[in-house]
Amino acid sequence: MAFSFLTQELAMDLGTANTVIIHNDKIVVDDPSIVAIDQNTNQLIAIGEKARQMHGKTHENIKTIRPLRDGVIADFNAAEQMIRGMIKQINTGSRWFTPSRRLVVCIPSGSTEVEIRAVRDSAEHAGGRDVYMIYEPMAAALGIGIDVETPEGNMIVDIGGGTTEIAVIALGGIVCNQSIRTAGDGFTSDIQQYMRHQHTIKIGERSAEDIKITVGSALSELEDPPASYTVHGPNLMTALPVEVTVTYQEIAHCLDKSLVKIENAIMTVLEQTPPELYADIVRRGIFLTGGGALLRGLDKRLKGKINIPFQVAEDPLHAVARGTGIALKNIGKFPFLIR
């Protein structure tokens, strides 16, 4: 691009759980979406992984905040500070001036006008001069190599931290979709409640996340099961330390209700799909992206329930970010970008 040195172009997957920034076709930031703030001065102390390590361990003068909840901005000031701080981390060489920034940011397909405005304002206040937005399922489709402008129907199920985005895409647009607030964070919360009620142990968000990653499963029978996982915490009745061993079968059981909600949402979108596009989807299968796609056995469970093949995308965690990066390079070409 002419005078590209005057403009810094960034693609941002502003996620509830993680934020990924792409610059010059490379992932330059991939950090948890969390900040640590000094309560007395309101100054930023840490962002990303450093702030995540403080989460649940702070004293009264330090507060950790996750700026996004259920896929949308819940704390405007914290979101702005996080975006600004993450952009500062990008090493683009020494500059004598602050470049004008062009940003493409992805948003949930079910976002209201107020929620879209909040994302735009946060990005602009953090230094974005030219801000575009793209719906997450469209970004996910681009990120896994789908030509979204053909008349062929493709279905994306993107299970992020805050929302599960389900969409049928054809001819450069979203034909039908549903965005539900049952996703990775909900799985983590399910595990915390299960441990509380079933094992009378209190565990934090980070420990529940570790359980989800280590022994999380959508099926109670796996061909290649993970080893059981041991977690430590206080007994809810006595406050004495206890050790509990968790199996993948238990986690499959405790996640069942949330997974049924996702299955029902997929069925709802399929019911809304025009017959010709439905036939394309049955032939091509349904694509799974997002961190939730990594849940063991999820593709098999969904195929068993819905009777359509499901494919876990290559590198599902970064599909949305990569698609946002592709959109950044095609701003003039893609009419589905939101100004």
What is each PLM-predicted segment?
Residues M1-I159, A167-F287, A293-R339:
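Nucleotide/phosphate-binding catalytic cleft detector across ATP-hydrolyzing
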